[in-house]
């Protein structure tokens, strides 16, 4: 806005306005940023322009993703996940859901399903899993998707693209096989 206020160059004003208008649209902002940088580099007329150009790699809208496991999202880090989703900021959360505590030996967790047999739940887990997706949907502005990563790569990519395009927070809960599932033939038989 400072550049627009201090120039009579209509092309420069238009480039600045296009950048401002597209700032929340990642794809459109890439082109607007490229055009703005080209315009500013053509004539460095003041310290403000020089300062902007010195930080040009930070001009375009950034994609923000948080990746974590189900132990983090459903249990120890749930308060933080909920806080991020409640903020209504444009951030994407991707949860790798193995439905057990994979890093500590496959114990039942809040992501484990009722009746699921796991370490310390040999007779089956007695309580149902936390409804993380449903909890996120109660905000009304969170994009939520549940996928099985290895089952359908197109669906996985579609969910990621939709989450990225969503203006606001998104949550993808991705079922992910792990060694604790004792898949016949091992993890080499998993399509991820």
Give, region by region, the residue ranges found by the protein language model.
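N-terminal leader/propeptide and maturation segments of large enzyme subunits in energy/redox metabolism
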Residues: 1-51
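Conserved thiamine diphosphate
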Residues: 2-10, 58-60, 115-165
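Thiamine diphosphate
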Residues: 44-107, 144, 150-167
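Short secondary-structure boundary/capping segments
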Residues: 80-84, 107-117, 185-191
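Glycine-rich loops and low-complexity Gly/Arg-rich segments
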Residues: 90-93, 117-121, 169-171
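Short C-terminal domain-edge/linker segments immediately following a structured domain
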Residues: 96-99, 122-127, 176
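Glycine/aspartate-rich loop-and-adjacent alpha/beta segment that forms the canonical ThDP
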Residues: 156-192
């Amino acid at each position: 806005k400072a550049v627009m206020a201090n120039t009579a160059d209509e092309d420069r004003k238009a480039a600045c306005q296009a950048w401002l208008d597209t700032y929340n649209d990642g794809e459109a902002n890439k082109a607007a940023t490229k055009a703005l940088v080209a315009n500013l580099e053509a004539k460095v007329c003041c310290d403000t322009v020089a300062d902007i150009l010195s930080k040009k790699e930070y001009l375009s809208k950034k994609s923000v993703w948080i990746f974590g496991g189900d132990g983090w999202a459903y249990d120890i880090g749930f308060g933080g996940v909920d806080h991020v989703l409640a903020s209504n900021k444009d951030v994407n959360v991707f949860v790798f859901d193995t439905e057990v505590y994979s890093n500590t030996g496959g114990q039942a967790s809040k992501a484990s399903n009722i009746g699921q047999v796991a370490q310390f739940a040999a007779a089956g887990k007695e309580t149902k899993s936390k409804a993380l997706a449903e909890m996120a949907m109660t905000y009304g502005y969170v994009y939520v998707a549940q996928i099985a990563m290895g089952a359908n790569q197109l669906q996985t990519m579609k969910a990621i693209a939709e989450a990225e395009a969503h203006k606001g927070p998104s949550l993808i809960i991705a079922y992910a096989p792990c060694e604790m599932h004792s898949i016949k033939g091992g993890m080499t038989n998993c399509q991820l």
